[in-house]
Amino acid sequence: GRDRFILSHAPGETADQLWVSIPTRQTVVIADYFQPFLPNAGNGKRRQRYVESWARALREMVATQPELALPMHGPALQGAATIASRLGKQASMLESIATQTIDGLNRGIPKYDIANRVELAPALATDPDAAELYSTPGDIAKTVAQEYSGWWNELPSEWNGSDRSELAQEIVQLAGGIEALHRRIEKLRHTDIRLACHLVDLAWLASPTDARVLQLAIDVWLQRLRTTEIPTQEAVTYVEHLVTLRQQRDAIVTR
């Protein structure tokens, strides 16, 4: 027929991702590039995602001046102005996170600190399409940092480190033993749940067959899920860990 389908390759959620322009229909098929929430560019359990290329693809789609955009998430977008606004804002979100991350890397700021500091400007952060359903700006920053600087977490001891359980056992001993750590975790879980989670992980790694430690870990991670707003992927990670903890506890209890 008379319609031309123009396929454009732009790494985004995957390395082989494509979007399609149909000029005669003033239409773009935008696949997973646009999502009606903060783009899922920060999944810590997947291969590399390409934040800068993702943003460029959104800009290129807007440049075709489509009247209809067909995403794989959410309903169709209609009207050139609406499409330009929504795709443009998401491009700005990704560009801002990438720029802040790369600037931080160039200034020698540790990757962990960059992820904790990255934030969107208020006008972008309050936009409905910035809802943190799957990823946070910090998650996306970690993806950008990995693309530019690899998997190392910048702690020299962890390039080729000790066994995690041995390290945890040493830290628990320095803390005064598992009972002392248990008391500290119980106190912290009511004031600083994130720190409590770090410590309960150490307790679990040091004593993975202690039913009391396993129950404490279950209680703390359940509290983390209940008391904070958590994006889906982060919540799934905690739920999967809870399943593991419960299986380990039940195996001990039923012996």
Predicted segments, located by residue:
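Accessory terminal helices/loops
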Residues: 63-68, 76-255
